[in-house]
């Protein structure tokens, strides 16, 4: 500032600042002297060609450095880990507005440099006209069954790679003349005595798109919503709505704590308590890791039941299963117990269905 200000006392100010910070002046002079001495030193003449081990060791070091760099960028070396994004800041604060204070400018620029910026959408109707056609807001009348559920516990299951085609109840046409009548016998029996919807529409196609679709009714975009800058915006999600009504909110997933960005988005939507593979292993050890994604669903469902049995009520809990995820393996003791079916996933679906049967029987 003193060099650009329009004044006549710049030299006096410089001398005063130098006197007050004399140790910094000495350090600066010492650095200059060291640079001058080092510059005059004769550099060792490098040989144009070296021995074969020089190049072999150089290639090995380069490959190791590249591998470490990839792991550093991704945040780990497992399939469960994804590179962190803006929404990961919400792991350290429940307030989306404060999350922006945690983020650094260089990181934000790098993560959003390929973003198209503001979302563009077509507006075909004004608000008044649209309200007469369809409104997403529904207000049940007093005395209806919906209002009688106030204060009840809510448990939501998000089942990996499950679809209607696995169920003989939902898609009986697929099993006409087939010896195997579906792969979800327990869930079918549950749906027969439950309030079941037969019309289902996908709001996401990949695991990473599931939570915004299910909790917040946010559809899929070209990029998963949790990886977009807009993910830090306020959303009226189901966990936040129930939290404001006095519910304890929890999210269970047997994968690693930072897997797929689930934990970050869960925090952002009002989830207070996260339970992951690390939490399970603190209680039950690491023997139930499936070797790929996390804890087997049967074991983790039982763990969730243990936690919920001690939980303050009312509570809202979500469980995201993973055993039916690729590469479609089941615990060794269950190999061959469930129908192999026509796809590699069918045996896993049967295994998870049985895990739900045991969970409902015990908890």
What does each model-identified segment do?
Residues 1-27, 45-49, 74-105:
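Membrane-interfacial interhelical loops
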Residues 3-7, 14-22, 42, 49, ...:
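Generic secondary-structure transition motif, activating predominantly at the C-termini of alpha-helices
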Residues 15-17, 38, 68-72:
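Hydrophobic alpha-helical transmembrane segments
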Residues 21-22, 41, 285, 363:
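Short, flexible coil/linker elements and helix-boundary hinge sites characteristic
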Residues 28-61:
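Cytosolic-side transmembrane helix boundary signature
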Residues 51-78:
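Internal/C-terminal transmembrane anchor helices
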Residues 75-363:
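Soluble catalytic regions of membrane-associated enzymes that act on cell-envelope
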């Amino acid at each position: 500032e003193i060099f650009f200000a329009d004044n006549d006392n710049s030299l006096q100010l410089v001398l005063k600042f130098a006197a007050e910070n004399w140790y910094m002046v000495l350090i600066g002079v010492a650095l200059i002297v060291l640079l001058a001495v080092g510059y005059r030193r004769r550099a060792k003449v490098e040989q144009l060609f070296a021995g074969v081990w020089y190049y072999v060791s150089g290639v090995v070091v380069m490959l190791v450095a590249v591998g470490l760099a990839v792991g550093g960028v991704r945040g780990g070396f497992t399939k469960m880990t994804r590179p962190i994004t803006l929404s990961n800041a919400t792991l350290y604060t429940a307030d989306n507005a404060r999350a922006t204070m945690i983020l650094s400018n260089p990181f934000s620029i790098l993560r959003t440099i390929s973003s198209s910026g503001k979302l563009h959408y077509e507006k075909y109707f004004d608000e008044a006209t649209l309200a007469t056609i369809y409104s997403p807001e529904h207000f049940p009348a007093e005395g209806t069954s919906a209002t009688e559920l106030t204060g009840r516990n809510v448990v939501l299951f998000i089942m990996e790679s499950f679809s209607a085609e696995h169920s003989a109840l939902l898609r009986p046409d697929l099993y006409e003349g087939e010896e195997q009548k579906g792969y979800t016998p327990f869930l079918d029996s549950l749906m027969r005595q439950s309030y079941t919807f037969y019309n289902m529409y996908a709001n996401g196609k990949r695991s990473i798109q599931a939570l915004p679709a299910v909790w917040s009714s946010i559809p899929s975009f070209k990029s998963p919503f949790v990886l977009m800058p807009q993910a830090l915006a306020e959303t009226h999600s189901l966990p936040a709505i129930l939290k404001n009504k006095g519910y304890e909110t929890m999210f269970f997933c047997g994968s690693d704590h930072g897997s797929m960005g689930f934990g970050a988005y869960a925090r952002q939507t009002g989830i207070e308590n996260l339970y992951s593979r690390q939490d399970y292993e603190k209680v039950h050890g690491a023997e139930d890791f499936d070797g790929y994604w996390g804890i087997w669903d049967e074991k983790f469902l039982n763990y969730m039941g243990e936690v919920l049995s001690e939980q303050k009520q009312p509570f809202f809990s979500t469980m995201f299963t993973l055993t039916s995820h690729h590469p479609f393996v089941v615990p060794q003791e269950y190999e061959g117990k469930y129908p192999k079916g026509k796809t590699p996933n069918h045996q896993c679906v049967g295994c998870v269905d049985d895990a739900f049967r045991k969970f409902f029987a015990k908890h």
